[in-house]
Every structure is written in C-alpha cells, then in structure tokens.
Amino acid sequence: MKLLVFILNKEEYLEEILEAFLELNITGATILDSVGMGSILAQDIPIFAGFKNLMKGSRPANKTILTLIPENLVQPAIKAIEQVVGSLEEPGNGLVFILNVDQIFGISKTF
C-alpha cells in the first residue's frame, strides 16, 4: 500500500483531479488546506519581507490531497494528475510524493 501526497497549487483543478481519481477507482482521499513556508515567512516575519517580491504571482494557499492506493495505481494516478495540471516537471504545477505504508489502523483493510 502507498500513500500518495499531492500538493495542488491551483485549487481550481481540485474537482477535476478527484474525478480523475474516481475513474481509476481511487474512491477515498483527504483534502487539506495548506500554505507553503515562503508564504508564511513573507507575511509574518519582517526580516523575510523581501520574499513577497519573489513570490508575486504565486498562490498563498494550496490543497494537499492524501490518498492510500495500491502500488499498481501509483503511476496511473500520477499520469492522471499530469493530464489535469500539466507536467509536474514544470514549476508551479504541484508536487507529488509517494510513501510506503506498512500498517493501517482505523479503516477497512480490504480496500
């Protein structure tokens, strides 16, 4: 089992991403509001105020999607994400990382 974590920079793609996951039979995910460290530093700490100029055009908030998936769905899920947001090699399209999950508690283990 794998945990796919996707930090979505463009919130307007959220519904389309979730629909793409459903087409792959990925039926569960948790969506969190998230903010990058640079945004916080630029807003709240005067010494880092120069970050504001560097971050013009970037979004202050993101959506972070967490979903547990079988290993055979990792590459199809990444491909589905890229079909919606564009290449993840391009800055600003988002960030995906995959973690191994050894044990799961609190949900059905048959999915």
Kindly give the residue locations of the regions a language model identified.
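Positively charged, small/polar-rich N-terminal and surface patches that mediate targeting and assembly
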Residues: M1-F111
